[in-house]
Amino acid sequence: MSELKKMKIRLLKLHPNAVIPAYQSAGAAGFDLCCVESLEIPPLGRALVSTGLALALEEGYELQIRPRSGLALKHGITVLNTPGTVDSDYRGEIKVILINLGAESFSIQAGDRIAQGVVSRLSIAELCEVESLDETARGAGGFGSTGKS
């Protein structure tokens, strides 16, 4: 397997309870983000959860904030705006919007892993207005138009 490019991300702890993110396995795509304070999210409730961290990404990259699959499966906890995007020029605190889709309140303790961050290279689109678009077999069909499942 080829060597993956490693990028240094400068982190600033904004809160004494902030946890420096870590990858949990050699093949993990994302590193875990932890919360700095305890809170409870009621069923169908949402919360803006602080990580106590700010960071600086290299230009041309973004940080995607994604749900942790175990929290989603076991408790119905997910990232509301998944994937959340942290731009390379943002320097404020990284916060995560969590929603509880489960039937019971969910308690989070300071230091709990609440989401994962995935660094992704950007492609910047050049948007060009045109008079018409090329025809395709699919056409304008959407929202289930290509099959049952």
Swiss-Prot record:
Recorded family membership: Belongs to the dUTPase family.
Catalytic activity: dUTP + H2O = dUMP + diphosphate + H(+)
A Pfam family of this chain: dUTPase
Keyword Metal-binding: yes
Pathway named in the protein's UniProt entry: Pyrimidine metabolism; dUMP biosynthesis; dUMP from dCTP (dUTP route): step 2/2
Keyword Hydrolase assigned: yes
A GO BP annotation: dUTP catabolic process
Keyword entries, A-Z: Hydrolase, Magnesium, Metal-binding, Nucleotide metabolism
Protein name: Deoxyuridine 5'-triphosphate nucleotidohydrolase
Cofactor list: Mg(2+)
Top EC group: hydrolase
EC number: 3.6.1.23
Superkingdom assignment: Bacteria
Matching InterPro entries: dUTPase, dUTPase-like, dUTPase-like_sf, dUTPase_trimeric
Molecular function via GO: dUTP diphosphatase activity; magnesium ion binding
